[in-house]
Curated annotation (Swiss-Prot):
Full protein name: UDP-N-acetylenolpyruvoylglucosamine reductase 2
One GO cellular component term: cytosol
Organism: Symbiobacterium thermophilum (strain DSM 24528 / JCM 14929 / IAM 14863 / T)
UniProt-listed PANTHER family: UDP-N-ACETYLENOLPYRUVOYLGLUCOSAMINE REDUCTASE (PTHR21071:SF4)
Active-site residue numbers: 176, 226 (proton donor), 296
Catalyzed reactions: UDP-N-acetyl-alpha-D-muramate + NADP(+) = UDP-N-acetyl-3-O-(1-carboxyvinyl)-alpha-D-glucosamine + NADPH + H(+)
Keyword Oxidoreductase applies: yes
Residue ranges constituting the FAD-binding PCMH-type domain according to the UniProt record: 31-197
Family assignment from sequence similarity: Belongs to the MurB family.
Reported cofactor(s): FAD
E.C. code: 1.3.1.98
Length: 308
């Protein structure tokens, strides 16, 4: 056992929660990605703090893996620690119309549990295949709703192990972004202020959202969700389609014929294929319409096309 593996085992007693050289394509919705040096399932804040301390001592990069649904990982993979939040980070506690939820909880699971209790405000999240923490950091949204509308407070753990409670103003919500993006902040818990609502109406609204998703998105192929953010006053998908790029292909990566702001994996696509195609789409749209699209997907590892 390597010295690093031994140190990880001193923190994570269950060896089944530590995987070495784990291919990340197994953990991303687009089914692309090279190996992580270590993929570690973290069950509580104590483990997380100790892992962050270890990473700081060893100068290791740290990545937080949610559902892997809006993520492209380089073919070379990533160095350091990839952490998946489980255990206490997936819990949901309801007190009246206030919900406390861990950053590792699934957004669709949370939306459905809220509706079953007659709590509204999260219907938009039923079709967003991500976690609460990732959704907060990018201010995920759909169907006219977003995280900014429901978040009352967030507890984050910084890369140096400090814990801090943040109000919405400190989080800095904006369209598909917050001030937490690009920082070391890890979302441990979120407090949400929901509203009492009719359960049948909530479930009906969510059925509509899910049916619309099935009708408009290429769910039959692995994909990473919306590739580009919508520019002000327009839609990325419309611009890409008007540029004649539906069906455009690099290797096994293809601009979806169903929704132009999705890139699908036809079978053996690589991260290089996807990022080369994204760059081609961005360049073509900018040349045709004078609009420079901004990536919505997160990109880990080697990435000369879309630098942070």
């Amino acid at each position: 056992m390597s010295p690093m593996a031994e140190r990880l085992r001193s923190i994570i007693r269950d060896p089944g929660r530590i995987r070495r050289a784990e291919p990340l394509k197994r953990h991303t919705s687009v089914r692309i990605g090279g190996p992580a040096d270590y993929l570690v399932e973290v069950a509580d804040r104590h483990e997380l703090s100790r892992l962050l301390r270890l990473a700081g001592e060893e100068a290791l990069p740290v990545y937080i893996l949610g559902s892997g649904s809006n993520l492209v990982v380089s073919d070379e993979g990533v160095r350091g620690l990839v952490l998946r939040l489980t255990g206490e980070f997936a819990r949901i506690a309801v007190d009246g119309s206030t919900v406390r939820v861990g950053g590792g909880c699934s957004l669709p699971k949370l939306a459905h549990q809220a509706s079953r209790r007659g709590l509204g405000g999260l219907e938009f999240a039923c079709a967003i295949p991500g976690t609460v923490g990732a959704g907060l950091v990018m201010n995920a949204g759909a169907h006219g709703g977003d995280m900014a509308q429901v978040v009352a407070e967030a507890t984050v753990i910084w890369g140096d192990g400090r814990m801090e409670r943040l109000c919405p103003g400190e989080i800095g919500f904006a369209y598909r972004s917050t001030r937490l993006q690009g920082t070391s902040a890890i979302v441990a818990e979120v407090v949400m202020a929901l509203r009492p609502a009719d359960r049948a109406a909530l479930e009906g609204a969510m059925r509509q959202h899910l049916n619309r998703r099935r009708a408009t998105q290429p769910l039959q192929y692995p994909n990473a969700g919306s590739v580009f953010k919508n520019p002000p006053g327009d839609y990325a998908g419309r611009l890409i389609e008007q540029a004649g790029l539906k069906g455009e292909r690099v290797g096994d990566a293809q601009v979806s014929e169903k929704h132009a702001n999705f890139i699908v994996n036809l079978g053996q696509a690589t991260a290089r294929d996807v990022l080369t195609l994204m760059d081609r789409v961005r360049s073509t749209v900018e040349r045709r319409f004078g609009v420079r699209l901004e990536a919505e997907v997160k990109i880990w590892g080697h990435n000369p096309w879309f630098p942070p």
